[in-house]
Amino acid sequence: MGRILQFSDVHFGCEHKHACAAALDYAHATPNDLVLITGDITQKGFPDEFTAAGEWMRAMPEPRFVIVGNHDVPYWDAVARVLHPWRAFETATGFPAHDGQFLGKDVMVRGVVTARGWQARPNWSKGVIDLDQTRRAAEALRQAPIGALRILACHHPLIEMVGTPMTGDVKRGDEAALIFAEAGVDLIMTGHVHVPFAMPIPLADRCSYAVGCGTLSHRERGAPPGFNQIDWDAKTITVTAQAWDGSSYRSHQVWRLPRRQDTRNAATAPSPVEPGALEKAFLPDAKP
């Protein structure tokens, strides 16, 4: 029924040039419904990095949807980090940093920002998701068309992955993941850790999954440069991690995920107007 190509952590400034060029060729040779880029398009947020990233993204087939990552803030510009951390990203990509959304024939994607220009903790690379943003995203997911694949896209994994080389350490991430699952999300698609993964979100017996993407940079963390191809039909979501072997892309890992069925029927889908129990519990101001 559909296909998405997910790229992440290209990190222009230390990008893998051959892998990036081959990714463009792959995207144009492979029919798809959306090219999704989940943040960290630059390494230090320098103007020339944003220029290169923008050119690469605009060379991708349409439609495209791009969200921001923690490396997409001007690293050495303290004023920009505090006052307008995402201006350069928005100028380069043409996409808003906050509350972006894509609606296709069979898929809906909602973007949220988990990166910050600065934080009240030493490691600013870690993630944060705020309550208002969670509320707006949950409402959007609940209102997705019946039968559409529902995706929440952000840069940091909302729940911690076992065995990955680093963490997202997202403030309020566990709660947000459960709220989004309750709201009907099929996939929470992320980057940041530079290795691919797919795992279920633990909420009752529903089939919502966290899916992570590798990197197209030289900042490898135990996995070759690569990206994800997501194919789905009425019953199954197939996540294929494509890996660069030095000359071409090959299938590196495959996950076949049973697709949740409640969102395919109006009688069983989450209410588009009434917040769920977890949404009400974690977000006290949630209102129908």
Task: Label each PLM-derived region with a short phrase.
Residues 1-59, 75-76, 136, 143:
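N-terminal active-site segment of His-dependent metallophosphoesterases
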Residues 1-5, 100-111, 142-149, 202-209:
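Beta-strand-turn-beta hairpins that frame and shape the catalytic cleft
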Residues 6-8, 35-40, 64-70, 151-154, ...:
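Active-site neighborhood of phospho(di)ester-bond hydrolases with catalytic His/Asp-centered motifs
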Residues 13-15, 43-48, 70-78, 116-123, ...:
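Active-site environment of divalent metal-dependent phosphoester hydrolases
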Residues 51-139, 144, 179-181, 229:
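Extended active-site neighborhood of metal-dependent phosphoesterases/phosphodiesterases
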Residues 141-161:
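Short acidic, glycine-rich surface-loop motifs adjacent to enzyme active sites
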Residues 162-238:
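Conserved beta-sheet core of the metallophosphoesterase superfamily
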Residues 232-288:
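A short C-terminal boundary segment appended to hydrolase-like catalytic domains
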